[in-house]
């Protein structure tokens, strides 16, 4: 009987513990948390899959950074395409860090920190916002002032400093009052494009 319990516990741990990686990766615990980060070799909290956050501002597109050119800020690693971009970031990191930890801005408007897609982005008022894809971007663009207000509200009151995994779980169960399904948002976007 005891052997069965040990085997069952090991089986459960084997299934559950691999799912803990995002809990650690997205929560570096040094001031930027949660963040849209992955673990890549020695870089345990790599922002935006290694994309150069400065290039959005200087080159007006995203590009991957080099593993050889990087900075660590508040426990999060940022890679850069050029040494010049690294120097610009090091001089003013808060200017270049994506809003909402690099999570999808549209998701944050619903208090849900979904991963952001580095190639879907906007700069509003000198700040970088990442989106989860074209659909999320288009839905957010339907009412930018309202969605920015909602996203900043939920980031400040619920998401910032929380564990992204638990926050997602909470808000997938307990929806915000203005919640809309993906289909409802897609329908609104389609109507707006007519």
Where are these regions (language model features)?
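Bacterial N-terminal signal peptides
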Residues: 7-18
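Short, well-structured hydrophobic secondary-structure segments
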Residues: 73-82
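Intrinsically disordered, low-complexity terminal tails and linkers in eukaryotic proteins, enriched
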Residues: 20-74, 94-194
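Bacterial N-terminal signal peptides that target proteins for export
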Residues: 1-7
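Extracytoplasmic
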Residues: 83-88
């Amino acid at each position: 009987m005891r052997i069965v319990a040990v085997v069952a516990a090991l089986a459960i741990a084997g299934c559950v513990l691999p799912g803990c990686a995002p809990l650690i990766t997205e929560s570096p615990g040094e001031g930027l948390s949660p963040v849209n980060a992955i673990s890549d070799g020695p870089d345990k909290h790599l922002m935006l899959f290694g994309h150069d956050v400065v290039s959005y501002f200087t080159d007006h597109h995203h590009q991957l950074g080099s593993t050889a050119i990087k900075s660590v800020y508040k426990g999060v690693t940022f890679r850069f395409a050029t040494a010049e971009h690294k120097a610009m970031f090091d001089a003013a990191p808060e200017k270049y860090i994506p809003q909402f930890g690099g999570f999808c801005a549209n998701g944050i408007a619903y208090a849900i920190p979904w991963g952001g897609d580095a190639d879907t982005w906007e700069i509003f008022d000198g700040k970088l916002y990442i989106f989860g894809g074209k659909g999320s971007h288009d839905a957010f663009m339907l009412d930018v002032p309202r969605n920015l207000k909602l996203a900043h509200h939920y980031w400040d009151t619920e998401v910032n400093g929380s564990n992204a995994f638990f926050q997602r779980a909470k808000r997938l169960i307990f929806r915000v009052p203005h919640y809309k399904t993906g289909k409802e948002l897609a329908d609104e976007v389609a109507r707006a494009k007519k």
